[in-house]
């Protein structure tokens, strides 16, 4: 059985992620039309209609009833459709009408979650939307172990605008696809990890950051600019935290955190685990000071389906402080 361990050193998280210890666990959803409502990608109007129909109050109520401490949502992924306006993105890619939604769903979610004491985090790939050829070309993105200097400068501009738009409404960012950190982000000359983190924190200096470089079954940190570990895993039974590499509640300065999914795969399918299994895994990691995020499929209207809501509620009940 594999164990989670430190692979790459990182610096101190400066206390930004301390709130995760109190939050303990949260929920992620992939609100991507190509996954939950493919027809919505036939036109910009169909996409806007889907985003407009997202029931933020209903979802906030579900998360509160489950006892989740935070919520992580995809801004977008590979299609080029996003859940918030971004003038920098529109200018850089030149696509009209814009594939960025008219509604700022991120801001609306934050406003619905804040009164319930639930923090909001956002997911974004570190590369261009891979299935939007026009955007890939305009952003000058080349997938692979390449410097991608022009792309990085443009992507930081996009990220900075979102960060400034949301300010303290967003408490953290989980960046996917950081598969080539040596080639892209570790060189001393900008743009690099430091400037990327600066763009992410432009609107909120307290935003926590995780950089994900794939499913590798290890709690790792890629940069001193990270505050918590991405730790994407397909099999949560393999998650182990301990040993001499875990010290003072940190993995070399970063707060330990694991992300896995409850469905048959990310964002899809029926529940694959029993309540007892997910409770055991969550309780085990939380008891050691880690935070755990569970991805659950979301419906077109923005609500979590009943089987998953029931399972999330079981986690919350089992971890409730008495």
Where on the chain are the PLM-derived regions?
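N-terminal signal peptide c-region/cleavage motif recognized by signal peptidases
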Residues: 8-10
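Bacterial N-terminal signal peptides
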Residues: 1-6
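Mature catalytic domains of secreted/periplasmic carbohydrate-active enzymes
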Residues: 13-322
